[in-house]
Amino acid sequence: MIDSLNNYNYDVNDSLKVENLTTEDYEEICKRLGRKPNRTELGMFGVMWSEHCCYRNSKPLLANFPTTGKNVLVGPGENAGVIDVGNDQKLVFKIESHNHPSAIEPFQGAATGVGGILRDIFTMGARPIAVLNSLRFGNLDKSSNISLLRGVVSGISHYGNCVGVPTVGGEIYFDDSYSGNPLVNVMALGLLETDEIVCSGAKEVGYPVLYVGNTTGKDGVGGASFASSELNTNSLDNRPAVQVGDPFIEKSLIEACLDAFKTGDVIAAQDMGAAGLTCSSAEMAANGGLGISINLDLVPARENDMTAYQYLLSESQERMLLVVKEEKLNILIEQFKKWGLFANVIGEVISKKEVIISQKNQIVAQIPTSALSDETPINIHKVIKEPPDYLQKKWKWSEDELPIITNNKILSFKDKKQYSLSEIILNLLSNPSIASKSWIYKQYDSQVQSNTVFKPGEADAALLRLRAQDERNKNNNFSGVAASVDCNSRWVLLDPYRGSIAAVAESARNVSCVGAEPLAITNNLNFSSPNTEIGYWQLSSACDGISKACIALETPVTGGNVSLYNESKNKNNQVTPIYPTPVIGMVGKIQNVDKAVSSGWKNINDQIWLIGSYRSESSIGGSSYLDYFHGLITGRPPKINLQDEKYCQTFLRDAISKNYISSSHDISDGGLAIALSECCILSSKGANIQLEEKNARKDNILFSEGGSRIIFSLNKMEETNFLNFVSINNKNFGSNIYVKKIGFVSEANLTINVQDEELCNLRVDELAEKFNNSISNSF
């Protein structure tokens, strides 16, 4: 075989810019190879040493996450995390981002984001059972943001609906910081019932490497490097870096792979996602402690004139790399072909710890696996010791700086007009970040597979029956899995540490609100450039907050994704970073889905109760009220006492399991008034609320935000049993937790009284009109 490794006919400086590599990187590559890299090899290093693939800026921070626990079977490092959910079932889950591709091709960017995360799930041997998403867009007063929203939602619904996996929930927020750089994070869940988890390490020398799925084209070339750089006015030129997906091939790939995995004849599996064939082959070899040899002439190609560089860096979708038992090879190939998929042997596992690539009888790349995958460079950043001055000034803000409330009216700093408290409630309900997302949910098939317990928006978390796929496990299993994705980006902007603690706490709280016990998280860290002092400080502080909350709540991190350089440049080179957005994907288990509760009231005259912590703060600093009504993003987010947070959630779950509670809803964006409004809207019933707060501003009572607060309802016939339950738990929780009755479910109006003074009296149909039509009315 002819060696073409010494073909250096390229401009080094220009090529380094294309690959997002530095001069220091180039020198290190030369040192590791013992020679200069050729152009193909440089491209391979470019994608493998990108932030997207090797976490070169964030790896030291991620190392501090708690990753082990009683239920964790597979933690970070594999395609997805795996936890034990009992009954011989395992839950596989992960979250990923497709931010940059969605910014320039919203439909395909979002669609392939769904396809990619689904492959991460079934690559582990699990059947995908659900998808959730966390989305961020600029405000809807700009037509470009509306176009992005429409495109992304269409892409998600198209791919998920066609592949037959329900989209069961999520969150969406709007802010101008995302106008040039939307966020598209997709979380997927899968159910695994086989004894063995399929991993990615190629551990048997001489075994064939099987390419399965779609053909390889030029779409997505350099996608990993593109995802690791900032967006600018020239980013539309990167449309070829966006992949094009085919959900019908994905569906065939799911079924064919799951059938193949059941045979036990597949030794290892890896999705060809970010960095394509380069990443899948290098990681497969490195994870197995061996090497791999690939012949590009055997790769099914969509086009005839593809170079080695294009083959290796293509991110064409619906492709898998498998290591299989040689004696079962032909049977497996026929099995894949039955599903209309390509199935070609393109190489083998070798003992020499190198990735060796050949094309047209020439070696076009030969790189030690450790150089590509294991010993990737780490960028060392100094973390500033004190929070930035501008934040410290914001933290000194006090609600006393707001206008005085007179006759239940207050002046808005935003438009200098007087509004009643009732008008403010309606105003907040029309905020697209708070308002109903039904226009979006209606485009998703949330019921396919028939395991969805609550429709999107009905409960604080998605809930699915863990209905066994395997006949051996069909033993009257009534258990279910709950999932939620959460992040209050405004809080993280104002205090990355507290804001990230709050994101973990809220995601756990949402899971608890349906009656499920939080078990583990996956996270998607969406941040701006780590090369600025503030950018890296935000990332570092957020990771510290996530770690602290996960330890306290006993919800280990099983994996996730880091998406940096989320910022946009305008024509004048002015940089607009996104709000730091560490999205938390929480999963939990409920023993009996029949006991789960949703958010809306159930019966007229049911009692309404509030549980909370005296030690967890609530304030209007950093609140939706302060932002949307007054136009102020200031103050310090309230501190959450994590011990009390855990107590409140445990109390609630226990009460739900004993059938005391009829409905449950956490208090988050918009505060108590908005939480009550949402319960009324979902049930088409009113609420009569009597509060006894003293010495507090009325807007604080209605709109303050914080942790550890949940409203719930119960049938008045259960009051005696419930009070006995409260008394028993008070001995365990002490005097730091309060549980108090605040009202009852009524027929048609939401009425809130404080010290016998009526603050608002609104018809439920008024509330619903504002809440349900806000997003659709923006178009």
Curated annotation (Swiss-Prot):
Q: Which residues bind ATP?
A: Y55, K94, N523, G560
Pathway membership: Purine metabolism; IMP biosynthesis via de novo pathway; 5-amino-1-(5-phospho-D-ribosyl)imidazole from N(2)-formyl-N(1)-(5-phospho-D-ribosyl)glycinamide: step 1/2
Tell me which InterPro entries the record gives. Answer: PRibForGlyAmidine_synth_PurL (IPR010074), PurL_linker (IPR041609), PurM-like_C_dom (IPR010918), PurM-like_C_sf (IPR036676), PurM-like_N (IPR016188), PurM-like_N_sf (IPR036921)
Q: Which Enzyme Commission number(s) are listed?
A: 6.3.5.3
* Keywords on record: ATP-binding, Cytoplasm, Ligase, Magnesium, Metal-binding, Nucleotide-binding, Purine biosynthesis
SUPFAM superfamilies, alphabetized: PurM C-terminal domain-like (SSF56042), PurM N-terminal domain-like (SSF55326)
Catalysed reaction equations from the record: N(2)-formyl-N(1)-(5-phospho-beta-D-ribosyl)glycinamide + L-glutamine + ATP + H2O = 2-formamido-N(1)-(5-O-phospho-beta-D-ribosyl)acetamidine + L-glutamate + ADP + phosphate + H(+)
- Gene Ontology BP annotations: 'de novo' IMP biosynthetic process
Instruction: Tell me where it resides.
Output: Cytoplasm
Signal peptide extent: none
Q: GO cellular component terms?
A: cytoplasm
Q: Identify the catalytic residues.
A: H52, H98
Q: Can you tell me which residues bind Mg(2+) 1?
A: E96, N561
> Which residues of this UniProt protein bind substrate?
S97, H98, N99, H100, R119, Q243, E315, S316, Q317, S563
> Where along this sequence does the record place binding of Mg(2+) 2?
D120, D271
**Which family does the record claim for this protein?**
Belongs to the FGAMS family.
Role this protein plays: Part of the phosphoribosylformylglycinamidine synthase complex involved in the purines biosynthetic pathway. Catalyzes the ATP-dependent conversion of formylglycinamide ribonucleotide (FGAR) and glutamine to yield formylglycinamidine ribonucleotide (FGAM) and glutamate. The FGAM synthase complex is composed of three subunits. PurQ produces an ammonia molecule by converting glutamine to glutamate. PurL transfers the ammonia molecule to FGAR to form FGAM in an ATP-dependent manner.
Q: What is known about its subunit structure?
A: Monomer. Part of the FGAM synthase complex composed of 1 PurL, 1 PurQ and 2 PurS subunits.
Cited HAMAP family: PurL_2
What is the name listed in the Swiss-Prot or TrEMBL entry for this protein? Phosphoribosylformylglycinamidine synthase subunit PurL
What organism is listed for this UniProt entry?
Prochlorococcus marinus (strain MIT 9515)
> Its gene?
purL
